[in-house]
From Swiss-Prot:
NDH-1 shuttles electrons from NADH, via FMN and iron-sulfur (Fe-S) centers, to quinones in the respiratory chain. The immediate electron acceptor for the enzyme in this species is believed to be ubiquinone. Couples the redox reaction to proton translocation (for every two electrons transferred, four hydrogen ions are translocated across the cytoplasmic membrane), and thus conserves the redox energy in a proton gradient. This subunit may bind ubiquinone. Its main location: membrane. HAMAP family: NDH1_NuoH. Pfam families: NADHdh. The chain crosses the membrane at residues 5-25, 45-65, 78-98, 122-142, 156-176, 192-212, 245-265, 271-291, 311-331. GO terms for cellular component: plasma membrane. Keywords: Cell inner membrane, Cell membrane, Membrane, NAD, Quinone, Translocase, Transmembrane, Transmembrane helix, Ubiquinone. Disulfide bonds: none annotated. It is found in: Cell inner membrane. One of its GO terms (molecular function) is oxidoreductase activity, acting on NAD(P)H, quinone or similar compound as acceptor. It is an enzyme of class 7 (translocase). This is NADH-quinone oxidoreductase subunit H. GO terms for biological process: aerobic respiration.
Amino acid sequence: MSEMLFFVITTIVKAVVILAVMASLAGLATYAERKVLAYMQRRVGPDMVGPAGVLQIVADMIKLFTKEDIVPANANKFIFLIAPLISAIAAFAALAPVPFLPEFEVFGHTIRPILADINVGVLYIAGVAAVCVFSPLAAGLASYNKFALISAARAVVALLSFEVVAGMALLSVVMVTSSLSLVDINNYQKGIFNWLIFKQPLAFVLFVMASFVECNRTPFCLTENETEIVAGYGTEYSGMRWAMFFIGEYTNMIAASIIITLLFLGGFNEFLFIPGALMIILKSSLVFFFFLWTRASWPHLRVDQLSMLCWKILLPLGILNVVITGFALLI
C-alpha cells in the first residue's frame, strides 16, 4: 500500500472515528451532568432506565428522533433550518487540529491521532470559535420570537467580547512556545514544571473564562436563562434540530476541556508512571467536571456585568499579561 493511499484511508477513518466518538461522548456528557448536579443537590438524578439510569441517553435519543419537527409560520424557514447545523458543524470542525493521543504504530505505519496537523492550529481554533456566534444569531433572527431575538443579541455581546480575551490568552501562550501548533505546544510542556499553567497562570484563568462563555456555561449562561428568556434562541425548536444545539454545546465543552489540557496542563505528556494517553483523559475529565461543578455552584451574571467584567477587567489584564510576557522574553 502506497503512503499516499494509506494517508487518505487513515484520514477518512480518523474523521469518522472522531465524529462517532465525540457525538457519543456528547450524549454521555448530558447523563454525566445530570448525575453530577443531582449529587450536588442531594437528588438521585436519572435512575429509571437501565442500571443507574445510564440508558436514559438512549431513551432521550429515541424521544428526540420521533418528535415532530415544527417550523413556526412566520419564521425564515431556510435560516431557521440551517442554524442548528452551524452549531454542530462548528463544534466538530474545531477538533481538526487537536492531537487527542500520542502517536502509535499499526502494521509498521505510524498513526497520529490528529485529523490535520497544521502549523497554525491555535489560529484555526480561534477562527472556528468566531464562527460559532452565527448559530445563535441565525436562530434568534429567523425564529420570529422575542425571547429568541433577545437571546441572540446576548450571544453576540458575550461571544464577541470574550473572543478578544481568549485571543490575549492565546497570544501569551504562542509568545512563550514560539509556535501556533498544538502539537508543538504540547511537546514544549514535557515535565510538570514546564506546564504553562505555572508559566502563564493569568492566561490560563482568562482562557478558561472565555471557554465558559464560548460553551454557554454558568455563570455566563446568558442565552438560555430559563427564568428570563425561556429556552433562548432554541425556544421555537423541537426534535433533533433542538438536540443539535446541545450536541454542539456539549461537543464544545469536551473540545474546550481537551484544548485547555493541551495548552496549559501538559497535554498527553507522560507523568511519573502514568502513560500520556491516560494523562490527557484524566486531565480533560477533570476540566470537564469543573464545567459541571460551576453550574451547581455559581449564579448567573447579568449582561451588563458580563460586559463590564470583560472590557474593564479581563481585557486590560490580558493586555498587561502580554506586555509582561514580552518583557520577560526579552530579558
